[in-house]
Amino acid sequence: MHQITDDMAKNIILYLVLICFGMQGYAKGKSEFMESKHIPLVYDKENTAECYPQIKMRSFEELPSIPELPDPFAWADGSGRSTDFKDWERHRSEIMQMLYHYEIGEKPAVKKEQMKAGIVDDTLYVDITVGGETLRLTAGITYPEGEGPFPAIIGIGFGTGSLPKDIFDKRGVAQIAFRFQQVMSHTQKRGQEPINRLYPDQTEMGAYCAWPWGISRIIDALEIVGEASRIDMKHIAVSGCSFAGKMALFAGALDERIALTIAQEPGGGGVNSWRVSETLGNVETLGRTNYAWFKESMRRFSNCVDRLPIDHHELAALIAPRALLVLGNPDYEWFAERSNYESSKAAREVWSAFGIADRMGYSIEGGHPHCQLPLSQYPEVEAFVDKFLLGKKNIDTNVTKAIIETQE
């Protein structure tokens, strides 16, 4: 059994990781890709990395100890590393495959011919038929005044998630409420959830595989109904808070049609590094998380997180080169904001390597209740919305604010 010892914990310190992969990648990537206009802000496909071959997955017994944060630029077969942007989709493929295999289960692919969609009285619906079974998902849309097409935010539970509605109202952003219970309940009874009607054999699937699948089907529905949706498909955001903040993060990581992800106070299992959290106090570690959200088999890593071949700075980095804003709240010990801070800094090095660090930001600030955005964080959210949903130029989104730094 491998455990994170005090000496190993010291090796996790982010600065060593930055020396290992971040700064090398930045030096090379900045010179090659300074013109960020060559790097897409969003894609028109759910997963552009699906063309890459399957990598060999090691058994639990074969996995080596990796006490430091894994290098997102290293190839899974050990053949070296590359920080070239042209190789990033292959890196994404390898990281996603490991995420599916070790943590959440594989997100099912759906063909357009398996879906029918429509919009009635500002309610979007999509019927997904697999193996003779049909599952219907619905999402209410709140439109601004005008004809559109409008930029849109998909909020978990509510149209803007837990973010203040006025931020989006005054900017003319449509608001789409994702009803996650239509896919899988918060507590999940394995094999008995709505999604299992379509995929009865996928009983190991975690909720953070199922819920992003549902969000992707809502985006499919918008594509299918076309102009009738009145949504600008190049400017879609997703947001949620707490467990829904994790949901938004996974959704953004696994669907490249999402231009902006705002993960609000996601805590353990979100941006937080499993490895760093293991060195902290009463926080949500891999062994103490909610296993309705993940594969049961991930429990094997509870006392040996150093053998997990990936970590969640890489989950966050799956969103690159698209935009990500991470919001944290250090007033709650369980959220392990030290882990969020270290992992966010490490993830941001991927964007930095491509010369687009302004597309990833983090703001960790206390003095407010959970899931209630304080006025002091409004500017960060508004800047990311203005730049990546409204397409405004000359907006400063170089956001790296964390009161964690003053609590050393």
Language model regions located:
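Cap/lid segment of the alpha/beta-hydrolase catalytic domain
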Residues: G155-A228, G267-V276
